[in-house]
């Protein structure tokens, strides 16, 4: 029987900075364990002289502490470290492949507040780690066996700073946009969330010819995601009105997700982006197997519009890693999450907010169509999502009344083509409740009942 992972969650290691497991001490151990595991992966060990790991981060203050700790661990195992500084998570994945490194690591807590941080790992090919490798790394951290593995003084690794990593990623992102098109004549608002995309996204858009109004582009280590970015898109939508812009782009802290605003200030989420891009690819025979991969959180309206156009939607559990795994298993090339993680596998190995925005811009420019009109391509089913902060993640079937209420809600909502989804977040102390159906009042009724039952028993 496999031992449960103790520090790896659904997207690497994450928590409050300087509190276990996101401490310098654990980062050092993770660095040592990761260095050893990647150095000895059978597929890589045969063909390499010196081994190397790319190390990037977002703009959090605690990134300095974790960067130095994890790099020290890696170096101590005889593996070189390639520092690339603040760069979007998809940029770290791309540079890992570009530099032919053994692995990539990015220090980020994505959309979380600045006082959280985390550590994500990528394989040599830019995809996220298999569970097996995560288990191997974690077992070395907790078993103590890593303490008995000590390369000699002349075998330790070297640290090198890669100065052109940002430029490499910028050119990679631009390559996802057709050479025959420019963004001349377009005014675009970009909210960078004071995060890792604060240089790359405005730069790419300007180089493609757009007039860019950038905000959330002055990180100070503590303002990442604070009242800005994809978690707080109101500022972006307001600036659309102020500047009479054609489009708004809002990233999260590591720029692996994106939300958009049309020219009227109307917000578009990942489901809207999937509908627009999937239908466009389908119309041009570019959607592999005529299939879009989405999670259980995505709106049922996606199925309706794709099926009407001759396509289909395959669903996975929540998490972009689950989406990517499904895409890899079957060769699909488009997938995403309602939250704004979008994977265009023709260009990227992971969620990339900038590349996703460029694909929508391509469709707008090619068709001469404003985003508000493109967004009318599908009809969203009424959906209500509640996030309940919890003090503990007790199994739902052990809570009084919760299973009964969920079952009753499912019975009523299924009669109108709806559904209920209740789960705990894999990255935050929250229970997430999704209700979907044809009648908003019914959704609100059941959301209130189930949320109240949860708050009484496990609410923070």
Language-model-derived ranges and their functions:
Residues 11, 55, 92, 105, ...:
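Buried hydrophobic positions in well-ordered alpha/beta secondary-structure cores of metabolic enzymes
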Residues 40, 44-46, 52-116, 203-261:
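N-terminal small/polar loop signature for handling phosphorylated ligands or for N-terminal nucleophile
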Residues 1-72, 76-77, 159-186, 398:
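An N-terminal, well-structured beta->alpha segment
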Residues 91, 135-170, 175, 263-336, ...:
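Proline/glycine-rich low-complexity loops and linkers
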Residues 55-58, 190-192, 262, 346, ...:
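Short glycine-centered, acidic/aromatic-flanked micro-motifs in structured strand/loop junctions
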Residues 247, 284-460:
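Phosphate-binding and adjacent anionic-ligand microenvironments
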Residues 2-3, 16, 117-240:
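Gly/Ser/Thr-enriched, mixed-charge loops and adjacent short helices
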Residues 128-130, 214-215, 266-285, 353-362, ...:
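Gly/Ser/Thr-rich active-site loops/lids in small-molecule metabolic enzymes
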């Amino acid at each position: 029987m496999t031992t449960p992972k103790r520090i790896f969650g659904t997207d690497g290691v994450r928590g409050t900075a300087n509190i276990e497991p996101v401490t310098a001490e654990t980062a050092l151990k993770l660095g040592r364990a990761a260095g050893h595991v990647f150095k000895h992966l059978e597929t890589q060990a045969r063909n390499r002289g010196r081994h190397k790991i790319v190390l990037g981060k977002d703009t959090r203050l605690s990134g300095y502490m974790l960067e130095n700790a994890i790099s020290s661990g890696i170096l101590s195992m005889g593996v070189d470290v390639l520092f690339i500084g603040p760069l979007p998570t998809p940029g770290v994945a791309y540079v890992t492949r570009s530099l032919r490194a053994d692995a990539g690591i990015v220090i980020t807590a994505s959309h979380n507040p600045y006082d959280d941080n985390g550590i994500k790992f990528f394989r040599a090919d830019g995809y996220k780690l298999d569970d097996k490798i995560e288990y191997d790394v974690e077992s070395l951290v907790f078993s103590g066996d890593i303490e008995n593995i000590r390369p000699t003084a002349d075998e330790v690794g070297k640290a090198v700073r890669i100065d052109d990593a940002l430029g490499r990623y910028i050119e990679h992102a631009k390559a996802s946009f057709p050479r025959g098109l420019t963004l001349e004549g377009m005014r675009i608002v970009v909210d960078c969330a004071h995060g890792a995309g604060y240089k790359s996204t405005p730069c790419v858009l300007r180089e493609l010819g757009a007039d860019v109004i950038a905000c959330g582009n002055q990180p100070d280590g503590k303002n990442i995601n604070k009242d800005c970015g994809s978690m707080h898109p109101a500022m972006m939508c307001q600036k659309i009105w102020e500047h009479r812009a054609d489009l708004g782009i809002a990233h999260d802290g590591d720029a692996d997700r994106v939300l958009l605003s049309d020219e009227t200030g109307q917000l578009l989420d990942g489901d809207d982006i999937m509908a627009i891009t999937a239908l466009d690819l389908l119309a041009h025979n570019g959607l592999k197997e005529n299939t879009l991969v989405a999670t259980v959180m995505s709106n049922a309206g996606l199925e309706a519009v794709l099926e009407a156009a001759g396509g289909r939607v395959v669903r996975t559990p929540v998490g972009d890693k689950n989406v990517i795994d499904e895409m890899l298993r079957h060769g699909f090339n488009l997938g995403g999450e309602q939250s704004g993680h979008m994977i265009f596998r023709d260009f990227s190995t992971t969620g990339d907010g900038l590349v996703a925005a460029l694909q929508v811009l391509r469709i707008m420019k090619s068709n001469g169509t404003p985003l508000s009109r493109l967004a009318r391509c599908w009809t969203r089913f009424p959906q209500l999502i509640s996030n309940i902060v919890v003090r503990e993640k007790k199994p739902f079937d052990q809570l009084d009344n919760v299973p009964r209420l969920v079952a009753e809600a499912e019975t009523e909502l299924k009669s109108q083509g709806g559904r209920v989804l209740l789960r705990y977040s894999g990255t935050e102390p929250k229970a997430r409740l999704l209700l979907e159906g044809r009648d908003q009042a019914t959704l609100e009724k059941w959301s209130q009942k189930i949320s109240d039952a949860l708050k009484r028993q496990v609410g923070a």
